[in-house]
């Protein structure tokens, strides 16, 4: 079992496994995994200014409920995990418990539990992940395109296009999920929150996304469970830096998605992992299938 050690210089908790080394930062706006290094190649995949597995925004239908980045929290350190708790507030009537657990040989699991005290339609935790801009994004999409048939999901790289330039691409789970990002929540600017146009496109085949460094054949993989993650968002890729929307590569997972009433409790899980890649880049999907066959996590006591 990997252990955590406090780094006095950063106040983050450093860890090392058989295949990766990294840091978990419970404090500040960019809490989460601030460093993740592939020990085989020495490559650091997280953008140095930001983090991964970062709890960014809280939403319901046409409602913004604040940003965990800016909210008070408490931290408990366990042998191989860091647990962060955000108490309920007037703006967000629910307690959030985020557990970052190091998993051998190459992963960090984020388990988030919501203990709801309010009534919310389409509740969402928007979780962000910011990576080295050299990394290229990939997603698997359902192959049911109009007028075309295919034998299985399609793996694609979202590339820049004038049709959706300047927007964030959203790959929803289903028709209900596709409505969430355009129901008004991303027009809410309370407490200085940013607004952006979200562009729902094709439906994802799995709650799975990965990025690649073609030269090193390294995959940075994010995965969740179908009932835990209802949409994946990304920034389109562009070979010309002038065509890029932002100076980093990123994936966001929209978590929960339920209609909630006081007393409801929900738990979701996301895994961040690194893997070598073969020529066919089959490892991320293999990792997802193995992950999806494991039992879902239990909520904390």
What residue ranges belong to the model's regions?
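Acidic-aromatic substrate-binding/catalytic surfaces of carbohydrate-active enzymes
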Residues: 2-71, 78-79, 83
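Extracellular structured ligand-interaction cores
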Residues: 10-12, 81, 95-99, 105-111, ...
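Broad, structure-driven detector of short, well-ordered beta-strand segments within folded domains
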Residues: 19-26, 94-102, 219-223
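Primarily extracytoplasmic ectodomains and periplasmic/lumenal surface modules that are beta-strand-rich
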Residues: 20-24, 28-33, 106-108, 117-122, ...
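Acidic (Asp/Glu-rich), glycine- and aromatic
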Residues: 107-164
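Low-complexity, serine/threonine/proline-enriched polar segments
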Residues: 146-196
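Extended, loop-rich substrate-binding clefts of extracytoplasmic carbohydrate-active enzymes
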Residues: 56-108, 114-122, 136
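Beta-strand-rich recognition/accessory modules
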Residues: 2-16, 175-300
